[in-house]
Amino acid sequence: MNLCRECYGIIGEGVVAEKCEACCNAFDRVEEFAEEIVKKMSEYEFETFNVGSRVWGSLKALQEYLSLKGIEYEIKQRFNTKLARAIEEKTGSKRTLNPDITVLFDLETFTFELQIRPVFIYGRYLKRVRNISQTRWLCGYCNGEGCEVCNFTGKKYVSSVEELIAMPAVRLFKARDAKLHGAGREDVDARMLGTGRPFVLEVIEPRKRFVDLKELEEAINSQKWVAVRDLEYTDAEKVREVKTERHRKTYRAKVVFEEKVERERLIEALESLKGEIRQRTPMRVSHRRADRVRVRRLYDARLIHHTGRVAVVEFEAEAGLYIKELVSGDNGRTRPSLAEKVGVNARVDRLDVIAVS
């Protein structure tokens, strides 16, 4: 078998020749490949990189054939090392694990692709208006295609917290897209006030990595509907932390009763409501949540204002407690409920989240 010097050194038999029947002269073309790769990499800001390669087709078949003869033809590691060294020399960047850019080289077709590590940004957001969703919500009738129901927007709601935060980030980072990971979510018709809700923004395929986050914060906050604060760079692990941590939340609800309720009776009901709450999946979300009973704690319930049939109440609760159903009882699916304790039908007219601790 005619082999280049690299493959001859790996296989240990054959003839050193100009044309390699094993790697098709991939080793001899490393500098050429590196030039092409570095040209593409220059479109992105990066400090670190890594190289991986794929073996399949005829090269894989050759490996299997040589293996039957007791010869281990491991080309990937040696090729990756040579290509990485060439890229290091041309860019001054370092090869590391968890890099900004990963080069995936196909040793069968001599093509490559770049995998760009996302940028992760932690912060807190405030939602100043009602009736926008936390994340993009496609129209259920056309699945995002656009129809008369959604006025050909493809969306159920006019906008979302995710879009209003992502759009400035995509522009500044010159990214393909951005995705919001929130610490829970408020109802579409609820505001998120106070110090805001923790979130991580995942910026996908950014061409710029080192954006001044103060500039990003100002760009987002120039809009009327959403604001952010305390932005800082983080990593992918923060997404898991934000999504799994059990945050205690405080809500302010405007409650409307079917008939007048005495103030003392209402205060007593709120006091007795504290403690363990058993909630079967609310009817309003049963189409997208598993139907089961969840046990959550209500830590505090305070009367802020009361006039006849209307009250303003603050609830401090464990994450996952549905406040609207805590008030109404949801036809007995939530027990105890404020309506049950007072003995009068009740509903939440307006709801704000005022703290996520």
Swiss-Prot record:
Protein name as it appears in the record: tRNA pseudouridine synthase Pus10
Catalysed reactions, as listed in the record: uridine(54) in tRNA = pseudouridine(54) in tRNA; uridine(55) in tRNA = pseudouridine(55) in tRNA
Organism: Archaeoglobus fulgidus (strain ATCC 49558 / DSM 4304 / JCM 9628 / NBRC 100126 / VC-16)
EC number: 5.4.99.25
Annotated substrate binding sites: Y251, Y322
Family (UniProt): Belongs to the pseudouridine synthase Pus10 family.
Domain THUMP stretches: 1-118
First-level EC class: isomerase
